Amino acid sequence: MIPFNKPYLTGKETHYIYEAVNSGKLSGNGIFTKRCQDFFEQRYGFKKCLLTTSCTDALEMAAILCDIQPGDEVIIPSYTFVSTALAFVRQGARIVFADSMPNHPNIDADKIEALITDRTKVIVPVHYAGVACDMDKIMTLATKYNLLVVEDAAQAIDSYYSPLPPSPLKGEQDTRYTNALQLNNPTKTPPLGGRGAGTIGHFAAFSFHETKNIISGEGGMLAINDERFIHRAEIIWEKGTNRAEFFRGEVNKYGWVDTGSSFLPSEVIAAFLWAQVEHLDMIQDKRKQLWHTYYELLKPLADKGLFILPDLPSYATNNAHMFYLVCHSLDERTALIKKLKDNDILAVFHYLSLHSSPYYNNKHDGRKLPNCDKFADCLVRLPMYYDLTKDDVKLICEVIKMKFNTI
């Protein structure tokens, strides 16, 4: 059986977990937490990173930092995981669902402005499959209407958004990435590819769930790009206390000063993640090779109109988080998944439309979201993981060709 996903282990995880266990500091915010946070801040340019126990927790922290009050409106795509909405619903927000683009599951930035009212407070673009949304358009709207932007970058670690940042002045060196390499990171420096996904909005939430490119079993991270929110974020992260200030020597004791929760992960989780971070570029290189093999082998079928392949906009890079194709009907997708399963290959569909979910359908305003519904009915995800081989990909593509009678 070729599974849909298989977690990749670098071989360093147990070594670092052992090191964490013997450090005398297991409860979190120790050496491995700091290594990971420093790495992400220096590699991508975030103002502040805080590891969390899940991406859901990172989104919930963002919702608190956005000061969501009952009745505030938050615009999100309907084609997303429930955590995107749930984090804001828990704070009392009313969710306003936006449709996807016709050719991509990402939110249609051209349809957002019509949804903005005097109660709108936040826009939450979701970078589906690691492909960035049209952030220039979204940030222009945020500035125009004084809104906050939370990037749901759960799938988008090591993705980039264009246009490219300004080049360093002549004679100067851009050290954003070389600094990261000094943090015990032996991987090569990635090429400059624009702004990192998650660095553009006020906040971004990342996932290190076992299905993601780099993993810690469960785990996430809140990235903060606006310095106004860093101080309060540390308090919320530490159960509503000013504990971080105490350990920096800024106060002589700490106490309960704000709302919050136990969002920080243990050092065991952070140690596992650090082993993955050290191999980030190697993991990315392999996944991209597999992604391009899929694309090259399936493009002739897509050119015949048998299905639709992922569309990559000119302003975004591909981090090879996922390879999917879009069938022309629900029945066709069901038949394709069955054909693959009959050949010991596990392919899966993805999200159901949140606007028609049992929990929220009676709260939705009734607008039709046809593009979202199309992806909910027709999108199928193919196996993608580090240990997948090119021969595996070729076999999968051969079965797909058999299904469409092109062999």
Walk through the language-model features, giving the residues of each:
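Conserved active-site segment immediately N-terminal to the catalytic lysine
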Residues: 151-162, 177-185, 196-215, 245, ...
